[in-house]
Amino acid sequence: MTDKIRTVQGKVVSDKMDKSFVVAIERTVKHPLYGKFIRRTTKLHVHDENNEAKLGDVVEIKECRPVSKTKSHTLVRVVEKAVA
């Protein structure tokens, strides 16, 4: 298989778990009737083996095989550190 692995960027909204965190991915969708663009947010649980990502960081994640019941993404890199 030569499918491209899907990577997305998002902001870390929770890092209270060990070796994992929650990232919020924001997208805009057009309202079907009125045409106004609306912001929609998707929250994903991400596996972080070395606990690199912290609250507020912008991170790049990729899809992988399921690590647990809710985690099916892994951390690729921290794009931007949060200002503390």
Curated annotation (Swiss-Prot):
One Gene Ontology cellular component annotation held by this UniProt entry: cytosolic small ribosomal subunit
UniProt KW Ribosomal protein keyword: yes
Key words of the record: Ribonucleoprotein, Ribosomal protein, RNA-binding, rRNA-binding
Gene Ontology BP, a term: translation
InterPro entries xref list: NA-bd_OB-fold, Ribosomal_uS17, Ribosomal_uS17_bact/chlr, Ribosomal_uS17_CS
Keyword Ribosomal protein appears in the UniProt entry: yes
Molecular function GO terms recorded: rRNA binding; structural constituent of ribosome
Any Pfam family: Ribosomal_S17
Superkingdom, taxonomy of origin: Bacteria
HAMAP family: Ribosomal_uS17_B (MF_01345_B)
Record's subunit section: Part of the 30S ribosomal subunit.
Task performed by this protein: One of the primary rRNA binding proteins, it binds specifically to the 5'-end of 16S ribosomal RNA.
Family per record: Belongs to the universal ribosomal protein uS17 family.
Record-given protein name: Small ribosomal subunit protein uS17
Gene name tied to this protein: rpsQ
